[in-house]
Amino acid sequence: MLACLTRGNLLDVLQEGFNEQQLQAYVAWVNAQLKKRPSVKPVQDLRQDLRDGVILAYLIEIVGQLALDSDASVDERTDFFLLHSPFKAAGEKLTGVQLSPSNQQEMKSNVERVLQFVASKKIRMHQTSAKDIVEGNLKSIMRLVLALAAHFKPGSSRTVSQGRDSKAPVQSHQPHCATAVAQGAAAALADVCHDVSRSGRDVFRYRQRNASVDGEIENPYWSVRALVQQYEGQQKSPSESSCSSLTSPSPIHSAKSESIITQAEEKADFVIIPSEGIENRTDEPDSPSSRDWRPGSRGTYLEATWEEQLLEQQEHLEKEMEEAKKMISGLQALLLNGSLPEDEQERPVALCEPGVNPEEQLIIIRSRLDQSVEENQDLKKELLKCKQEARNLQGIKDALQQRLTQQDTSVLQLKQELLRANMDKDELHNQNVDLQRKLEERNRLLGEYKKELGQKDRLFQQQQAKLEEALRKLSDASYQQVDLERELEQKDVLLAHCMKGETDEVTNYNSHSSQRNGFVLPVAGRGATTVTHRGPQTSDLQLVRDALRSLRNSFSGHDPQHHTIDSLEQGISSLMERLHVVETQKKQERKVGGRSPRNQASSEYRASWPPNSTLPHSQSSPAVSSTCTKVLYFTDRSLTPFMVNIPKRLGEVTLKDFKAAIDREGNHRYHFKALDPEFGTVKEEVFHDDDAIPGWEGKIVAWVEEDHREN
C-alpha cells in the first residue's frame, strides 16, 4: 500500500497535480488503517473528515502500534537497522486530544497536538501549519498522510522482513572470506560511480529541457500553462528514477535504499518551495511576483528557482558520492591491509601469502592496484588543486604588487601636490606681507589727510566767523537803510505837499498869464530835483556792490565762499526790487492825473543805474513774471547755479543784457542751452553783444567760463 502512495505520487502531491484516482488511493489507505479500530468511522473526504485532528490522532496510534508489532517479528541479525529506527517509541496514545471538538479552536488544538508529535519524533515533512489543515487544505493533509506512511511503513516492513527471513539461511552459509568482501566493496564502488554518472545525465537532460523552454519563451504564443506543464514534466523524471531505486529488490541496494529515500524526501523539500510559490501566485494574481509569470519576461521566477535548486542538489549529491567513495576506499584498505590508509606505516607489502589460493591473491593484488590508482588520482587532484591555489596566490601577489606600484605613484603625486601647495602658501604669505605694508602706508596717508582736513576746517571756521561779522555789518547797514528809507518817505511826503503847492501856484500863475496873452510856461526843475534827491541812494548801492566785489576777489577761484557772497548780493538786489515794487504800488494808489513828480522821479531813479549794475534778483516776483525772463547760469567757481530776472521777453534778450545782469569782471565765454533740429539738445556759444540769446523751455540756461586767452 505504501508503494502505491509513493510511486509516482510524491511530486504530484507536492505540486498539487493529483487526480481523483490518487485521492481515492489515499482514502483507501487511511480506511485500511482505521479498520483496526472498529469504533472509528471510515473516512469519506480527506478535506472534511481530517480537519478536526481526531482521525489523525487515531491514525498515528494505529500505524505506530503496527510498526512495533512488525518490529517484534523481525530477525535481530538481519533487521538491526529497523530496530534502531526513529519510530521505535511510536504507538503511544496522544494526550490532550478532544475526541468531539465543538468549535474551530478545539480543532486547531487537536491538529497542533498531532504536528507537535510529528516534530518530536523528527518525522520528515515540509512545513505545514495547523491553520491549513483546519481550513481543509488538501495538499497539506496529503503531505501529512504521506509523511506518516513513509515514516512508519507498516505495510512494507513485513515484506522486507519476510524476504530477509527467506534469504537469511542462504546468506548465513556463505563464507566471509577476503575475496568476497573485496568483490562486495568493488561492486558497491561501481554502484556509487553509476549513481554519480546517472545524476550527471539527469543534469544534462535538465539543461536540454531548459534549452527547449527558452525556445518556447521566445515563441510569441508562449503561455503560463505551457511553462507549468514543462515544470511538471521536469519533475517527473527524477521522481521516477528515485522511486525505481526505492522498489529495487536487490540485496546489494538494501543498505542504500534508506539513503535514496532520504534524498527523495530532500528533493521533495526542495520542490515544495516552487509549488507553494505557484499556489500563492494563483491565490494572489495582483502580487508583484505574479508579474514575473507574464509571457513578455525572459527568465521567470520558476525557471531560476528550479535551476538553482537542481544545481544545489547536484552539488550535494556529488559531495555525498565523494564521501561514499572515500568510505568505501577506506573499507577496502581495511579489508585488504588490516588498517586504514592514514594509519598505515612504512612496511613491505607481501605480494604472495602462504596458504592462499592464487586466484584470491590475484583478486587482492588487483584490488590493491585499483586502490593505488584511486589514491594516485586523488593525489593528482590534490596536486592540481595546490597548483591552482599557487597560481591564484601568484595572481594575487602580482595584483598586490601592481596595486602597491599604483599607490607609490599616487604617493609621489600627492607629494608633488603638497610641494606645490607649500610654494603657493609661501607666495600667498609674501603677498599678505606686501598688502599689510601697503595698508600701513595707506593708514599713514589717511592720518595726514585727516590732519590737513582739520586745518582746513579751522580755516573754514575762521572764514565763517569773518563772514558772520560781514553779515552783521550788512544787517546794520540794512537797518540804517530802512531808517533812511523811512526818512526818505517823510521827505517825499513833504516834497509832495511842496510840489502840490507849487503846482497850484503855477496853475494860478498860468491862468493869470493866459488871461494876459494865452501862453503857458513849462514846468522846470522837477526832474533835476528828483535826480538830486535820488543821488545818495544810488551811490550807497554802488558802494555795497564794490565792497562785495572786493570781498569776492580776496578768495581763490574754487573757494565755496563765492556762493555765500553771491547769495548776499542776490539778497540785496531782491531787497531793492521789493522797495521798487512798494514804491510802484504807492504810486498807483495815489492815482494822480498825469505824470506825478514822484513817477517822474522814480523813472529817473531807474534810469540813474549805471550800465554795469546788477538787475534785481528774484525767484518769485508776481509783478514782473509776465514781462521778465528767468536766467539760470553756472560758473566755474561754484557748483550751485545762479538765477536772475531780465525785464524782457524771451527772444528779445541779448548778450549785452545778460552781461549787465550777471555783472562779471574780466573776459568770459558764454554758452547757452539750445535745441538743434539735427543734433537735439546742444550748447550754443554767443560772441556778439547784439545777438539774441536762445531759450530752453521758457527760460535761459547759460554757462559762464573765464577766458584765459590773450587778447
Swiss-Prot record:
Phosphorylated on tyrosine and serine residues. Polyubiquitinated, leading to its proteasomal degradation. WNT3A signaling increases DIXDC1 protein levels by inhibiting its ubiquitination and subsequent degradation. Abundantly expressed in brain and testis and to a lower extent in lung, kidney, colon, ovary and urinary bladder. Expressed in brain, liver, testis and spleen (at protein level). Expressed throughout the brain with strong expression in main and accessory olfactory bulbs, cerebral cortex, piriform cortex, hippocampus, habenular nucleus, dorsal thalamus, superior and inferior colliculi and cerebellum. Residues 278-295 have a biased composition (Basic and acidic residues). Keywords: Actin-binding, Cell junction, Coiled coil, Cytoplasm, Cytoskeleton, Developmental protein, Phosphoprotein, Ubl conjugation, Wnt signaling pathway. The keyword Iron does not apply. Gene3D superfamilies: 2.40.240.130, Calponin-like domain (1.10.418.10). Residues 233-258, 271-298, 584-623 are annotated as: Disordered. Residues 237-254 have a biased composition (Low complexity). The keyword Coiled coil applies. It comes from the Eukaryota. Residues 153-326 are annotated as: Actin-binding. Residues 597-623 have a biased composition (Polar residues). Residues 600-680 form the DIX domain. Residues 279-452 form a coiled coil. One of its GO terms (biological process) is negative regulation of neuron differentiation. Signal peptide: none annotated. The modification Phosphoserine is found at S212, S257, S618. The coiled-coil domain mediates interaction with MAP3K4 and inhibition of AXIN1-mediated JNK activation through MAP3K4. Belongs to the DIXDC1 family. Positive effector of the Wnt signaling pathway; activates WNT3A signaling via DVL2. Regulates JNK activation by AXIN1 and DVL2. May bind filamentous actin. Directly interacts (via DIX domain) with DVL2 (via DIX domain). Interacts with gamma-tubulin. Interacts with the complex composed of DVL2 and Rac. Interacts with AXIN1; competes with MAP3K1. Interacts with MAP3K4 preventing MAP3K4 interaction with AXIN1. PANTHER family: DIXIN, SEGMENT POLARITY PROTEIN DISHEVELLED. This is Dixin.
